[in-house]
Amino acid sequence: MLCRAACSTGRRLGPVAGAAGSRHKHSLPDLPYDYGALEPHINAQIMQLHHSKHHAAYVNNLNATEEKYHEALAKGDVTTQVALQPALKFNGGGHINHTIFWTNLSPKGGGEPKGELLEAIKRDFGSFEKFKEKLTAVSVGVQGSGWGWLGFNKEQGRLQIAACSNQDPLQGTTGLIPLLGIDVWEHAYYLQYKNVRPDYLKAIWNVINWENVTERYTACKK
């Protein structure tokens, strides 16, 4: 379900969806834990601002942009439709990425995955530690704002690591199905870790929800 949900969310964000009839309105998802639940690794102030301000802004701007798009679509205004594409990508990607991100985290997270996901990580990266090192390095190395991702290549049946700039969604950008995302925008860590992104990356491994990542992996293999 998680894989299908991610894919269907991406389709709903497409400009043609809902052109006829009532238009789907996106909403801010509730967190599955309290704002302070991830402390001391990610503090409550960051979580509150990140969720209730930043993610909410992506949702609101996405709805507003889609409204303008559908008005332009109804008028046959192709120029406006094209002009709105960057805003659809940015705000739609922000909504997709953060919706995955919140479920990728848990106050009971950390440690290592189990079962077939762990075996796949060992197969594709050599060991769990090598995987952590690579995803950490890719995430730390993002220039400016963006995301580090563990994704599933459906065609090859293998796990891959990738980085996306700004709010570019992983699947729409690379074709990889998102399993685990690490937000490296400064708003995700600056209030606690200042400009030391590597310290934030070191801390976030303590709250990774491997059960959620495993569910996504299992669903996407079907």
Curated annotation (Swiss-Prot):
Keywords from the named record: Acetylation, Manganese, Metal-binding, Mitochondrion, Nitration, Oxidoreductase, Transit peptide, Ubl conjugation
Record PTM N6-acetyllysine, positions in chain: 68, 75, 114, 122, 130, 202
N6-succinyllysine sites (modified residues): 68, 75, 122, 130
Localization annotation: Mitochondrion matrix
Gene Ontology CC entries for this record: mitochondrial inner membrane; mitochondrial nucleoid; mitochondrion; myelin sheath
Listed GO biological process terms: acetylcholine-mediated vasodilation involved in regulation of systemic arterial blood pressure; apoptotic mitochondrial changes; cellular response to ethanol; cellular response to oxidative stress; detection of oxygen; erythrophore differentiation; glutathione metabolic process; heart development
Effect of residue 122 to R: Reverses IR-Induced increases in superoxide and genomic Instability in SIRT3-deficient mice
Comment on bound cofactor: Binds 1 Mn(2+) ion per subunit.
Transit peptide: 1-24
One example GO MF annotation: superoxide dismutase activity
UniProt modification remark: Nitrated under oxidative stress. Nitration coupled with oxidation inhibits the catalytic activity. Acetylation at Lys-122 decreases enzymatic activity. Deacetylated by SIRT3 upon exposure to ionizing radiations or after long fasting.
Record Gene3D superfamilies: Fe,Mn superoxide dismutase (SOD) domain (1.10.287.990), Iron/manganese superoxide dismutase, C-terminal domain (3.55.40.20)
PROSITE patterns on file: SOD_MN
Cofactor(s), by name: Mn(2+)
Chief place of localization: mitochondrion
Chain positions recorded as Mn(2+) binding sites: 50, 98, 183, 187
UniProt modified residues of type 3'-nitrotyrosine: 58
InterPro entries assigned: Fe/Mn_Superoxide_Dismutase (IPR050265), Mn/Fe_SOD (IPR001189), Mn/Fe_SOD_BS (IPR019833), Mn/Fe_SOD_C (IPR019832), Mn/Fe_SOD_N (IPR019831), Mn/Fe_SOD_N_sf (IPR036324), SOD_C_sf (IPR036314)
Catalysed reactions listed for this entry: 2 superoxide + 2 H(+) = H2O2 + O2
Subunit structure: Homotetramer.
PANTHER family, per the entry: SUPEROXIDE DISMUTASE 2, SUPEROXIDE DISMUTASE [MN], MITOCHONDRIAL
Family, similarity comment: Belongs to the iron/manganese superoxide dismutase family.
Name listed for the protein in its UniProt record: Superoxide dismutase [Mn], mitochondrial
